[in-house]
UniProtKB/Swiss-Prot annotation:
<keyword id="KW-1160">Virus entry into host cell</keyword>
<keyword id="KW-0426">Late protein</keyword>
<dbReference type="InterPro" id="IPR054564">
    <property type="entry name" value="Gp18_domIII_N"/>
</dbReference>
<keyword id="KW-1171">Viral genome ejection through host cell envelope</keyword>
<keyword id="KW-1035">Host cytoplasm</keyword>
<dbReference type="GO" id="GO:0099000">
    <property type="term" value="P:symbiont genome ejection through host cell envelope, contractile tail mechanism"/>
</dbReference>
<keyword id="KW-1227">Viral tail protein</keyword>
<keyword id="KW-1162">Viral penetration into host cytoplasm</keyword>
<keyword id="KW-1229">Viral tail sheath protein</keyword>
<dbReference type="GO" id="GO:0098027">
    <property type="term" value="C:virus tail, sheath"/>
</dbReference>
<comment type="subunit">
    <text>Homomultimer.</text>
</comment>
<comment type="function">
    <text>Polymerizes as an extended helical structure around the baseplate-tail tube complex. During ejection, the sheath shifts to a contracted form, thereby making the inner tail tube protrude through the host cell envelope.</text>
</comment>
<keyword id="KW-1242">Viral contractile tail ejection system</keyword>
<keyword id="KW-0946">Virion</keyword>
<protein>
    <recommendedName>
        <fullName>Tail sheath protein</fullName>
    </recommendedName>
</protein>
<dbReference type="GO" id="GO:0030430">
    <property type="term" value="C:host cell cytoplasm"/>
</dbReference>
<dbReference type="Pfam" id="PF22671">
    <property type="entry name" value="Gp18_domIII_N"/>
</dbReference>
């Protein structure tokens, strides 16, 4: 084709920084049971997108954990929620039934290549269009389920809340916590108490279900840089076990649990979660919001740069990427989500052979916002103000 043209041509040159949008974080994902749930609304082993949690309860039945968990979430907030319903276990005794239920929750890959149970959460985004970021299995998170949940959380870059399954004492809880080393998990003990409208009595209410809803609420109203701790919980009337807590006294039950990496429950101006720590074996991710900040920053930066993949590697492209990331960091800093962050291009990491192979390395660092876990007020008694008192009297 000839290059000759008698007239005007316009060539678009699409250069410059791109706007970077923060990934959505207030999306709950949970696995539940409900043998009497509406099978069309909640099919077995299929991720279901719920945009109105309170309305979905009408189709959740009364058996199993689904309806109670949905209500616990609805009491806190109105998050987008992905629900996975699995079949209840069968057997001659409760132990056998629970074992089968645990297997159903953990899931596998069936003969048709479809994921089931928790593993189906990995396909939730392709089915529902949203990626669950806040995960749990309220009321059924045995140690085996918690281990499986940790793996799913790592793959989705999500955060999971688990109970100290079967633990009755603080020493048992501390020992149970040693089963986990993942930064993506938080252990919570004990449970709440709440009114059960099915039995018309006060019953144990899964703390993990309320953690899912409250986490979403905090994300929506304050941000992912705020931990779960010290925020009022709705819809509960008590705590299922005695936990000694005092705002000023050290060495309390709550302190022992928090020090061991367990979040507990307290009553002070209502009921609250008390604790910031994850199960991480790396001190860099000691706090819940440190993990979530790492996840959000990583996903935000990666998802925002699909446009750059397969474009010619030029100085302009590199500058656009670096400038765009730094602009986003300034926004996050201004809004209080991070302390600060910087992105840069390293010549040492990007030599001729690297660029020739179609590879590009962009570096950045960031500082998450620490939670104020221990406030010390240093009080002193002095007589120096008495001189001012005498002076003020004589001046009148």
């Amino acid at each position: 084709m000839s290059d000759y043209h008698h007239g005007v041509q316009v060539l678009e040159i699409n250069e410059g920084t791109r706007v970077i949008s923060t990934v959505s974080t207030a999306i709950v994902g949970m696995v539940c049971t409900a043998s009497d749930a509406d099978a069309e609304t909640f099919p077995l082993n299929k991720p279901v997108l719920i945009t109105n949690v309170q309305s979905a309860i009408s189709k959740a039945g009364k058996k199993g954990t689904l309806a109670a968990s949905l209500q616990a979430i609805a009491d806190q907030s109105k998050p987008v929620t992905v629900v996975m319903r699995v079949e209840d276990g069968t057997g001659d005794d409760e132990e056998t039934k629970l074992a089968q239920t645990v297997s159903n929750i953990i899931g596998t890959t069936d003969e048709n290549g479809q994921y089931t149970g928790l593993k189906a959460m990995l396909a939730a985004e392709s089915v529902t269009g949203v990626k669950p970021r806040i995960l749990g299995v309220p009321g059924l998170d045995t140690k085996e389920v918690a281990v499986a949940l940790a793996s799913v959380c790592q793959k989705l870059r999500a955060f999971g809340y688990i109970s100290a399954w079967g633990c009755k004492t603080i020493s048992e809880v501390k020992a149970y916590r040693q089963n986990f080393s993942q930064r993506e998990l938080m252990v919570i003990w004990p449970d709440f108490l709440a009114w059960d409208t099915v039995t018309s009595t006060t019953a144990t209410a899964y703390a993990t279900a309320r953690a899912l809803g409250l986490r979403a609420k905090i994300d929506q109203e304050q941000g992912w840089h705020k931990t779960l701790s010290n925020v009022g919980v709705n819809g509960v009337t008590g705590i299922s076990a005695s936990v000694f807590w005092d705002l000023q006294e050290s060495g309390t039950d709550a302190d022992l649990l928090n020090e061991s990496g367990v979040t507990t429950l307290i009553r002070r101006d209502g009921f609250r979660f008390w604790g910031n720590r994850t199960c991480s074996d790396d001190p860099l991710f000691l706090f819940e919001n440190y993990t979530r900040t790492a996840q959000v920053v990583a996903d935000t930066m990666a998802e925002a740069h699909m446009w750059a993949v397969d474009k010619p590697i030029t100085a302009t492209l590199i500058r656009d990427i670096v400038d765009g990331i730094n602009a986003k960091f300034r926004e996050l800093k201004t809004n209080g989500y991070i302390v600060d962050a910087t992105c840069w291009f390293s010549e040492e990491s990007n030599d001729a052979e690297t660029l020739k192979a179609g590879k590009l390395y962009i570096d950045y660092d960031y500082t998450p916002v620490p939670p104020l876990e221990n406030l010390t007020l240093r009080q002193r008694i002095t007589d120096k103000y008495l001189a001012n008192l005498v002076t003020s009297v004589n001046s009148n």
